Amino acid sequence: MQWEVVIGLETHAQLQTQSKIFSGASTRFGAEPNTQACAVDLALPGVLPVLNREAVEHAIRFGLAVNAKISPASIFARKNYFYPDLPKGYQISQMEIPVVVGGHVEILVGDEVKVVELTRAHMEEDAGKSVHEEDFTGPYGEPSSGIDLNRAGTPLLEIVTEPVMRSAAEAVAYAKALHGLVVWLGVCDGNMQEGSFRCDANVSVRPKGQVEFGTRCEIKNLNSFRFLEEAIQYEVRRQIELIEDGGTVVQETRLYDPDRGETRSMRSKEDANDYRYFPDPDLLPVVIDDAWIEDVRSKMPALPAQLREQWQSEFGLSAYDAQLLTQDRDTAKVFEELLAIVGKPLAKAAANLITGEFASSLNRAGIAAANAPLKAEHLASLLTRVADGTISHKIAKDIFAILWEEAIAGKAISTVDQVIEAKGLKQISDSGAIEAIIDQVLAVNQKSVEEFRSGKEKAFNALVGQIMKASQGKANPGQVNELLRKKLG
C-alpha cells in the first residue's frame, strides 16, 4: 500500500521585546534562576496583567508580512492546566479570536515554489522551565528538580499552519523560511539554542487517495531543523509500521530523543475542551484599528518575497539564488550594496560571488554576514577586474582567498590590484602568447589531439585543462577555447 504523509506545524516564536507580555520584568536570557520574575509572573494575589504594546505590534508586523487578516478585536483567554512551571495554573493565550487569521508562507522545495497556508497566529505567554540536572540535589543529597520562572510571561507568537505539508523536507523548508522571515522582520531573534524559535510537528499518515486524515501525533519542542526532519521521518516510519502490523495509532503527544533517533510517548493528546478555555476577565479585547496597522506597515522593511520577485524579474536571477540572497537581511544588504557599486550588468556575477565564495567563507568561519571582514567595495573590485578581462574567474577565487585570510588575521587588506601586481596574476589575453602555449601543449599531447579528431569531446576539455595549467591559470579561458578549436580544425 502507498501512504501519504500529512504534516502541520505549530511554531513558537519568542517576540523580541525588552519586557514580558503582561509585566515589566526583563526577558533577557541567561540570568540567574528566578531573578527576572515579578509579582505578575508569579501570580501573586492582587496583581493584574498589563499588555505589552510592542508585542502586539510584532504580531501585526508578522500578519502583514504573510498577507493575513489582522483581527480588529482579538481576545485573550485562559488555557487551564496544571504544570509545576505554570504559576497561575493557567496560561494566558488566545483561542476564539486570534490577532492574526490566515496568511501564507512561500517555500522552495528543490526548484519548486510551494505555498504553505497558515491557519492563525496568536499571542500568548511562555511558561517557566523545569530544571533537571545531575548536580541538582535536595536537602538530603537526593536527586531533585528545580523551577526557573525567568521565562514565565515571555511573549510568544504561536504560528499554526494548515496540514498541507507532505514530507519532512517540506516541513523543514517551511520552518527555515518562517525562521528567516521572523528574524528579518525583527519579530524574533531566532536563537534556537536558547528556545526563541521552536516547533511542534503534527504528523499523521493515510492511504494514498484517502480524503480523511489519519490519527495524528504531536511531537513537541523541536529546537533544530535537523531534529525536526529526523523526528518526522521516524514518526512516519513508526506509524506506517504500526498500521501495517495491524495496530492503531493513538492520538498522543510525543518527544523526540535525538540520542536514540526516535520519538517516545509523553502523554495522551488533549483537545481544546480539556483546557476549558474562557475569556480572561482581567484583560480587555485588543482593538487594532486601520491607523495602527498602517503605522506598523510604514515602518516595515522590504520583504524577502518582494526582493526575490524583483531580483528574478529585473536581473534574471534563479529562484534558488534569490532564495539564498534573502535568507537574512544582512546577506541581502551586502548584495544591494555590491549592486549599487557594480550596476545591473554584473548582477548575476555579484549573486554568484555572494552565494558562492562569500557564503562558504562565512560558514567556515562561523561569521554572520553583518560581521563579514570583507565589505562590498572589496567584492566590487574583484568583479570589476573579472569583467574587464584583467583576471579570470579562477584567479578571482584565489585573490578572494588571499583577501579573506588577510581580513580574518586582522591585517591591512590589500587592494585587488595590489594582489594582482604582487603575484603576477594578470590574465594573458594576448592571442600570440596564448597560441604559443597551445602549440607547446599540443606538441606533447598528440594522443588527446587524435582522440578529439575522432569525435571524443572529452579530449578537448583535457587539452584546455593542460593549457590552463601551463599558463598557471592566467590564460583567458574564452580565447583558449576559441584558438584551440581553430588549431584543431
From Swiss-Prot:
InterPro entries named in the record: Asn/Gln-tRNA_amidoTrfase_suB/E (IPR017959), Asn/Gln-tRNA_Trfase_suB/E_cat (IPR006075), Asn/Gln_amidotransferase (IPR018027), Asn/Gln_tRNA_amidoTrase-B-like (IPR003789), GatB (IPR004413), GatB_Yqey_C_2 (IPR023168), Gln-tRNA_amidoTrfase_suB_CS (IPR017958), Gln_synth/guanido_kin_cat_dom (IPR014746)
Alphabetized GO MF terms: asparaginyl-tRNA synthase (glutamine-hydrolyzing) activity; ATP binding; glutaminyl-tRNA synthase (glutamine-hydrolyzing) activity
One GO-annotated biological process of the protein: translation
One Pfam family named in its UniProt record: GatB_Yqey
Disulfide bonds: none
Superkingdom, natural source: Bacteria
EC primary class: ligase
UniProt keyword annotations, A-Z: ATP-binding, Ligase, Nucleotide-binding, Protein biosynthesis
Gene3D superfamilies: 1.10.10.410
Keyword Ligase: yes
Nucleotide-binding found in the keyword field: yes
Catalytic activity: L-glutamyl-tRNA(Gln) + L-glutamine + ATP + H2O = L-glutaminyl-tRNA(Gln) + L-glutamate + ADP + phosphate + H(+); L-aspartyl-tRNA(Asn) + L-glutamine + ATP + H2O = L-asparaginyl-tRNA(Asn) + L-glutamate + ADP + phosphate + 2 H(+)
EC numbers for this chain: 6.3.5.-
Subunit annotation: Heterotrimer of A, B and C subunits.
Family: Belongs to the GatB/GatE family. GatB subfamily.
PANTHER family: GLUTAMYL-TRNA GLN AMIDOTRANSFERASE SUBUNIT B MITOCHONDRIAL AND PROKARYOTIC PET112-RELATED, GLUTAMYL-TRNA(GLN) AMIDOTRANSFERASE SUBUNIT B, MITOCHONDRIAL
Function: Allows the formation of correctly charged Asn-tRNA(Asn) or Gln-tRNA(Gln) through the transamidation of misacylated Asp-tRNA(Asn) or Glu-tRNA(Gln) in organisms which lack either or both of asparaginyl-tRNA or glutaminyl-tRNA synthetases. The reaction takes place in the presence of glutamine and ATP through an activated phospho-Asp-tRNA(Asn) or phospho-Glu-tRNA(Gln).
Protein name: Aspartyl/glutamyl-tRNA(Asn/Gln) amidotransferase subunit B
Name of the gene this protein is made from: gatB
